[in-house]
């Protein structure tokens, strides 16, 4: 019975996925993922990216956000990206495969950053969801806390932090924490984000010294 339910659920997800207009547009344009459109909407409203910036992209694979960001920062910009999963190369992106919760991977990531002044830290990280909020939300909050910690370590004063967060227990506290660190904080729900999804995007600009 459980197997049948899981199969039906998977079938519904696949049907929804491939009928999604943003998935179809991404395929037509040769984009890595529909996440490209989410970041485009954020850029249109918040003007995060500028030519020449250095960016850290966490949870980067398959590369939708990095693929978008390189079009905004140009040849003089640089992206340091990290993910557990492999990612096909993108010109202008220095990709590190590994779990940045691992001390050696984190060290390698920070070495890539070096003395660069990072203007944007962005995270589209999400755990493998089991469908139970009591399990999924704490896992997701753990990842966004790590992303915020990374922004504390490498983000230059005045820099920006963009992070995907799933609404639920701990969200309000996390938002308060970000507001204490940045001068302007917005919560965005892009049109390209599925309406039934708990995901929202916190866009924080003007990191306080």
From Swiss-Prot:
Residues annotated as the enzyme's active site: 164
EC number(s) recorded for this UniProt protein: 2.1.1.166
Binding of S-adenosyl-L-methionine, residues: 63, 65, 83, 99, 124
Subcellular location: Cytoplasm
Keywords: Cytoplasm, Methyltransferase, rRNA processing, S-adenosyl-L-methionine, Transferase
GO cellular component labels: cytoplasm
EC class: transferase
Catalytic activity: uridine(2552) in 23S rRNA + S-adenosyl-L-methionine = 2'-O-methyluridine(2552) in 23S rRNA + S-adenosyl-L-homocysteine + H(+)
Source organism superkingdom: Bacteria
Pfam families: FtsJ
Gene3D superfamilies cross-referenced by the UniProt entry: Vaccinia Virus protein VP39
One GO MF term attached to the UniProt entry: rRNA (uridine-2'-O-)-methyltransferase activity
Main location: cytoplasm
Database matches in InterPro entries: RNA_methyltr_RlmE (IPR050082), RNA_MeTrfase_FtsJ_dom (IPR002877), rRNA-MeTfrase_E (IPR015507), rRNA_MeTrfase_gammaproteobac (IPR004512), SAM-dependent_MTases_sf (IPR029063)
HAMAP family listed in its UniProt record: RNA_methyltr_E
Record-linked NCBIfam families: PRK11188.1, rrmJ
Function: Specifically methylates the uridine in position 2552 of 23S rRNA at the 2'-O position of the ribose in the fully assembled 50S ribosomal subunit.
Family statement drawn from the similarity comment of this UniProt entry: Belongs to the class I-like SAM-binding methyltransferase superfamily. RNA methyltransferase RlmE family.
Name of this chain's protein: Ribosomal RNA large subunit methyltransferase E
Organism encoding this protein: Klebsiella pneumoniae (strain 342)
């Amino acid at each position: 019975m459980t197997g049948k339910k899981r199969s039906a659920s998977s079938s519904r997800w696949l049907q929804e996925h491939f009928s999604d207009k943003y998935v179809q547009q991404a395929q037509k344009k040769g984009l890595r993922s529909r996440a490209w459109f989410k970041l485009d909407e954020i850029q249109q409203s918040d003007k995060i990216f500028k030519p020449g910036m250095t960016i850290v992209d966490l949870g980067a694979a398959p590369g939708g956000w990095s693929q978008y960001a390189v079009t905004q920062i140009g040849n003089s910009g640089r992206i340091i990206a990290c993910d557990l999963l492999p990612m096909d190369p993108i010109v202008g992106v220095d990709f590190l495969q590994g779990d940045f919760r691992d001390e050696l991977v984190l060290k390698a990531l920070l070495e890539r950053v070096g003395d660069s002044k990072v203007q944007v830290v962005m995270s589209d990280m999400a755990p493998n969801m089991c469908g139970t909020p009591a399990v999924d939300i704490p896992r997701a909050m753990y990842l966004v806390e790590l992303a915020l910690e990374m922004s504390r370590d490498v983000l230059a004063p005045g820099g920006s932090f963009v992070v995907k967060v799933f609404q639920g227990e701990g969200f309000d506290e996390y938002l308060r924490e970000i507001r204490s660190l940045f001068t302007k904080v917005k919560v965005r729900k892009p049109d390209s984000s599925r309406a039934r999804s708990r995901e929202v995007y916190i866009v924080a600009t003007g990191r306080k010294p």
